[in-house]
Amino acid sequence: MNAPVNLSSDAHKAVMNDVLQRQKAAHLRDGPPSAEKRIQWLNRCIDLLVGHQAEIAKAVNQDFGSRSPEATSLTDVAGSIGPLKHAREHLTKWMKPEKHKTTPAILGLFGAKATVQWQPKGVVGVISPWNFPVNLTFAPLAGVFAAGNRAMIKPSEFTPATSDLLKAMFAKAFNEEEVAVFVGGPEVGQAFSGLAFDHLVFTGATSVAKHVMRAAAENLVPVTLELGGKSPVILSRGADMATAAARVMNGKTLNAGQICLAPDYVLAPQEDVEAFVKEAQAAVSRYFPTIKDNPDYTAVVAQRHYDRVKGYVDDARAKGARVIEINPAGEDLSQQEHRKIPPTLILDPTDDMKVMQEEIFGPVLPVKGYKTVDEAVDYVNAHDRPLALYWFGTDEAEKDRVLERTTSGGVTVNDVIFHVAQENLPFGGIGPAGMGAYHGYDGFREFSHRKAVFQQLKKDIAPMLGLRPPYGEGIRKYLAGQIKK
């Protein structure tokens, strides 16, 4: 639903809280949904994506100014259907109680049982971002619905056409007691994050996440925060530079680098920096013979983000960096209908440059040389823990050393970003890059309450062990057996 306009944050909160209370009441009234009901919810989501593919591509293109339908279908549509299908296929197995051994084990021999029962939390709030506005709404819902929850969604105000479309889509397939969408600006988001959800998922900037977490803390709402950071690429001396550059630049130019997992900077052996630059230029020329009117090359979403990314380049240039714009056709991009920034390499970057201090979130890639791989590891560890780390090479011992000595949300070896597509792996950050994880079974677990259930023996053995007053020799023997090394 649309959040009413011209309302205070408190008024917005009251409107949304009414829906929240109705969803919670419906959850209690209906009880935990069956596997069939959960599959029905997932199927409705899949049907929405399949049936609105063209409309989604049109809306996203309108919001970005230029993004090809193929890019949107790949990342936002197909990228959402995959997780939903995976959850649909496996949720019946996931829902089964998890059997555990009893403590002490002898209790189990006589019939006692210890299990974990997976219980829906209730109502989950989802705050989705602008960079993949459809995928980062539907992908969390795969776990939310598999776990048997209802959902309230606040899509980004920076992609208004897509947000309005999402609102209309969900209204066609779900009633408000199942899913409700609220569209609006920061005041709506502020009110939304302060609701007493049973769980809240936020995907976006670390700076905003602090406000979201603070608001959620007022109601002790557990949160999953999917944030970002400066995800490094470490190129080993054994890396194939042509392959590495092609894969890094593919990840860096996808959605014009507006991806939380985009490679943020490259650490390369000093003697290989120029080879990487040459191969990066060749790869971009293959991918994008032209940029200005090429729909395959995505625009930056808004003027303030365009100015921010251009500001990083200007700051680096002013502080002595070598700046290489990869513009295969030599087009004049100073006057253009859309906000396109060509892939840009920043060589000889220093830590006083903004491009090395802040997440870039655009098609700009600093390349920094190193003498030893330990130097590269130390550089990564001297900064905030990133959402992802990428290593390219053939030396298994070096790979293991890098992965053991660095901490990141996830890792892809010999490519970038692809670990996010693995539904059998958790996706999440650590530290400033986020907390919690979802995707596949991990999403089911994240959005479920793990209820511990112990079923005692029918026969009362406590008196036999002397565990009840008045205490005597029986309990002393029992304790003597327990309190020892």
From Swiss-Prot:
It comes from the Bacteria. GO terms for molecular function: aldehyde dehydrogenase (NAD+) activity; coniferyl-aldehyde dehydrogenase [NAD(P)+] activity. PROSITE patterns: ALDEHYDE_DEHYDR_GLU (PS00687). It is an enzyme of class 1 (oxidoreductase). The keyword Transit peptide does not apply. The keyword NAD applies. GO terms for biological process: aldehyde metabolic process. Its EC number is 1.2.1.68. GO terms for cellular component: cytoplasm. It catalyses: (E)-coniferaldehyde + NADP(+) + H2O = (E)-ferulate + NADPH + 2 H(+); (E)-coniferaldehyde + NAD(+) + H2O = (E)-ferulate + NADH + 2 H(+). The active site is at E226, C260. Pfam families: Aldedh. Keywords: NAD, Oxidoreductase. PANTHER family: ALDEHYDE DEHYDROGENASE, ALDEHYDE DEHYDROGENASE ALDX-RELATED. Belongs to the aldehyde dehydrogenase family. This is Probable coniferyl aldehyde dehydrogenase. It comes from Caulobacter vibrioides (strain ATCC 19089 / CIP 103742 / CB 15). The gene is calB.
